[in-house]
């Protein structure tokens, strides 16, 4: 059992009378920004509008946790594979008693009563106040903002302050300056068209039909993925679901009957709910993204128990449940060993403080032996989605160093898909595990795109997989989809199959992947053609070795097994 601070006891200890007017504390600006061009101010909310806010408390020792993460994730380390327990992670990630006391006392002094701990380590304080009270507390001006394209409205502010004497205890207040665009369904479905593209076949001998329609059989041929069933019931593969995208069991049955006839058509997945998420079953409720993600995990990671984690609309974390799903998994004693997500944002949407906090949540989960994979995005160098820009826009969480970013390829000869998002973070520094590979690329790149990206930032993606003309079944009909949304579940399936064999051999699972990946570039098919245009440029070119379009390349299952010591 994790021993965390008792907020009830602390609140009682910190209680002071709120009948008297508290002394105004000196304030310090915590964050500020301008209105993003995709949003417009819509005036002041009513003074009594209720705002659900969260304060992210400073965590005890995230530098220590980062060292521990790399110790257990770097193959050359004597601690490799000795993943941390929930209790061990909590010792790093929980706030200090001093921080809890100080922030709780300040809130109570100002008449805030409903103070609730949240997060797996009680590292957030949640509370609700009126808009007028929030203005007073944070020396700010909350406003209504509207997302111009969708019409969705948010209450946010462009600047807020916190007491100077609490700066050492508070990472951020949220949601305040975060302006995330509504999540959208990435892949677009089209009807399969007969015929094949004129593309050269690759050495592993996938049939030329795979140039036009990608199926599980194509992936098995291209990457050497086995069809034999996994054997370890403790090995779990998690699939994130958002924005009311529902994975259909009927569509999965049809998919398996058509494209994996060697598997029982009754093979299915389990469902886990976060924030009241559901998984409604009907052809009308079919979700292209959800069906894609489930069909290319259940249908590729043969026999691996798969969990569809559906995040509902009942979230107040300001980022569509991205915080809540990681908090939910972090609170579990045995979370799935692999998690794939095919959604994301642009890095500037979150701001550096929130991006860092979410990224650190991935660190806590990775330290426990969870491989976290995200689709890199579909906007080339212009971000998660194609958009106008003058300088390159990093996707999020692409720039986070504690997850694995997956780009896209196409064709049997595997060239870079032109939409594959990649580039360099403006928030996160380049981690040591990729320093050599990225330096080599930048030296070869020379002055190309100079001034349009941050060459010292964390570079992404890390690896890639097929992402064009991928066949799925949706609403009872077969069709083709494209996007890095295809690539992440495919690579996640490969990792899960390797984990199955590791567990069977009595070895630890791969866990946080990146140090292992960059230490073993020979375990991937290097992609040397294509680019990811955007921002009125040709983007970055793919080339020998790592590149910011396809990363280290696509999986070679046999070589990855060897690298894993199997």
Q: What is each residue range found by the language model?
A:
Residues 1-23, 297:
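Fungal secretory targeting signals
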Residues 22-117, 126, 131-406, 433-480, ...:
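Substrate-binding/charge-relay-adjacent region of secreted/lumenal peptidase catalytic domains
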Residues 121-123:
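Ser/Thr- and Asn-enriched, surface-exposed coil loops between beta-strands
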Residues 286-287, 418-423, 541:
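Short, surface-exposed amphipathic charged segments that create phosphate/polyanion-binding patches used
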Residues 400-437:
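Non-catalytic alpha/beta scaffold blocks inside enzyme catalytic domains
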Residues 410, 449-452, 495-548, 556:
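An often Trp-containing, charged/polar helix-loop segment at the C-terminal end
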Residues 484, 548-550:
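Penicillin-binding protein/beta-lactamase superfamily catalytic region
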């Amino acid at each position: 059992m994790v021993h965390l601070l008792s907020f009830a006891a602390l609140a009682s200890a910190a209680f002071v009378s709120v009948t008297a007017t508290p002394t105004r504390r000196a304030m310090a600006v915590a964050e500020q920004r301008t209105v993003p061009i995709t949003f417009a101010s819509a005036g002041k909310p009513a003074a009594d509008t209720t705002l659900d806010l969260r304060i992210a408390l400073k965590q005890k020792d995230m530098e220590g946790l980062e060292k521990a993460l790399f110790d257990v994730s770097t193959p050359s380390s004597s601690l490799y594979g000795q993943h941390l327990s929930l209790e061990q992670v909590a010792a790093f990630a929980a706030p200090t008693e001093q921080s809890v006391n100080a922030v709780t006392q300040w809130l109570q002094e100002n008449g805030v009563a409903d103070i609730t701990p949240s997060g797996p380590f009680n590292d957030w304080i949640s509370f609700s106040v009126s808009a007028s009270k929030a203005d007073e507390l944070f020396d700010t001006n909350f406003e209504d903002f509207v997302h111009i394209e969708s019409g969705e409205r948010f209450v946010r502010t462009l600047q807020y302050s916190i007491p100077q004497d609490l700066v050492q205890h508070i990472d951020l207040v949220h949601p305040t300056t975060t302006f995330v665009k509504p999540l959208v369904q990435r892949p677009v479905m089209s009807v399969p068209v007969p015929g094949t593209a004129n593309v050269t076949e690759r050495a592993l001998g996938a049939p030329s039909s795979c140039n036009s329609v990608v199926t599980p059989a194509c992936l098995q041929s291209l990457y050497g993925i086995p069809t034999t069933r996994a054997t370890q019931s403790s090995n779990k593969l998690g699939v994130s679901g958002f924005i009311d995208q529902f994975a259909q069991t009927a569509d999965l049955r049809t998919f398996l009957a058509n494209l994996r006839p060697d598997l029982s058509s009754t093979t299915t997945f389990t469902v886990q709910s976060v924030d009241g998420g559901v998984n409604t079953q009907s052809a009308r409720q079919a979700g292209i993204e959800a069906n894609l993600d489930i069909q290319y995990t259940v249908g590729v990671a043969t026999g691996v128990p798969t969990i569809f984690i559906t995040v509902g609309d009942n979230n107040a974390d300001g980022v569509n449940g991205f915080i809540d799903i990681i908090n939910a998994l972090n609170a579990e004693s045995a979370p799935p060993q692999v998690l794939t997500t095919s959604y994301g944002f642009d890095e500037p949407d979150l701001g550096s403080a929130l991006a860092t906090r979410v990224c650190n949540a991935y660190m806590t989960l990775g330290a426990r032996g969870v491989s976290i994979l995200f689709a890199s995005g579909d906007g080339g160098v212009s971000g998660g989605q194609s958009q106008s820009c003058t300088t390159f826009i990093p996707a999020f969480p692409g720039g986070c160093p504690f997850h694995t970013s997956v780009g896209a390829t196409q064709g049997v000869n595997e060239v870079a898909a032109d939409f594959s998002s990649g580039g360099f973070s403006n928030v996160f520094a380049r981690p040591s595990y990729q320093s050599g590979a990225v330096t080599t690329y930048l030296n070869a790149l020379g002055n190309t795109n100079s001034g349009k990206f941050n060459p010292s930032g964390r570079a992404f993606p890390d690896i890639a997989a097929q992402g064009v003309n991928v066949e799925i079944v949706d609403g009872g009909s077969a069709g083709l989809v494209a996007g890095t949304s295809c690539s992440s579940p495919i690579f996640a399936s490969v990792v899960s199959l390797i984990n199955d064999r590791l567990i069977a051999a009595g070895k630890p699972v791969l866990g946080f992947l990146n140090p292992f990946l960059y230490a073993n570039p020979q375990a991937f098919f290097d992609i040397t053609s294509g680019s990811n245009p955007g921002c009125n440029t040709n983007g970055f070119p793919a080339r020998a070795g790592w590149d910011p379009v396809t990363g280290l390349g696509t999986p070679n299952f046999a070589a990855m097994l060897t690298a894993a010591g199997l």
